[in-house]
């Protein structure tokens, strides 16, 4: 338990003392704090900090579990989903304004999708928004930007298998577009081509990477 608390504390170091106290209380005694504020604080930081955006889902899951157990309510989850919906509607403007904020948002939403469960199933409300963001990332202009390609690959590794189980047709469509880009789009860097091929083979192998494939792709990336 101490190790887990230290990990959570580490993720909070970017916050001032008041916000740290808010989040620590939300994690342990969610009925005693403003959970809408806590959700917005986590979202705000996730849009600024790539590392935090990748880990925030775990914090959100912990707060949701604690709130359900202690109060039987879903205030934090509702506030979090409302904020994600607002950011989803504004995603085109976000991408135009700040590429880093955009990839942080995608990472945050995929991380929340990865962690949050209702009746042991991923949240249906997030399936199409996550897919829409991944489709944004396979557009020709996005595939010319290293940050967006890295984000695409990371999120497909993280949630691709879960997403496919929730809606196989959209995953087929996504990979059809991804394959067309790999084969037909000019101007892609050799690293992007390598990463796209890796994703195509990764899905074809049942969302698993063989040792041989891992050694090949990642020795190429490191070179």
From Swiss-Prot:
MIF4G domain residues: 7-206
Main location: cytoplasm
Keywords: Cytoplasm, Nucleus, Translation regulation
Pfam family, one: MIF4G
GO CC terms: cytosol; nucleus
Molecular function per GO: RNA binding; translation activator activity
Family to which the UniProt record says this protein belongs: Belongs to the MIF4GD family.
The protein, known as: MIF4G domain-containing protein A
Native species: Xenopus laevis (African clawed frog)
Lineage: Eukaryota, Metazoa, Chordata, Craniata, Vertebrata
């Amino acid at each position: 338990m101490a190790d887990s608390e230290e990990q959570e504390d580490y993720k909070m170091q970017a916050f001032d003392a008041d916000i740290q106290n808010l989040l620590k209380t939300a994690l342990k005694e969610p009925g005693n704090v403003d959970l809408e504020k806590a959700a917005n604080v986590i979202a705000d930081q996730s849009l600024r900090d790539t590392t935090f955006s990748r880990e925030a889902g775990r914090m959100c899951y912990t707060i949701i579990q604690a709130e359900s157990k202690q109060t039987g309510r879903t205030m934090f989850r509702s506030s979090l989903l409302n904020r994600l919906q607002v950011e989803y509607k504004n995603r085109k403007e976000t991408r135009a304004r700040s590429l880093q904020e955009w990839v942080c948002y995608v990472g945050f939403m995929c991380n929340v999708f990865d962690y949050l469960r209702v009746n042991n199933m991923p949240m249906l409300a997030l399936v199409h928004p996550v897919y829409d963001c991944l489709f944004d990332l396979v557009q020709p202009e996005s595939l010319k930007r290293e940050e967006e390609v890295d984000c695409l690959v990371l999120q497909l590794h993280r949630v691709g298998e879960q997403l496919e189980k929730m809606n196989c047709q959209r995953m087929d469509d996504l990979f059809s577009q991804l394959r067309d880009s790999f084969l037909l789009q000019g101007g892609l860097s050799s690293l992007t081509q390598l990463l796209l091929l890796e994703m195509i083979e990764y899905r074809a192998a049942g969302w698993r990477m063989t040792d041989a494939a891992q050694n090949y792709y990642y020795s190429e990336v490191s070179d």
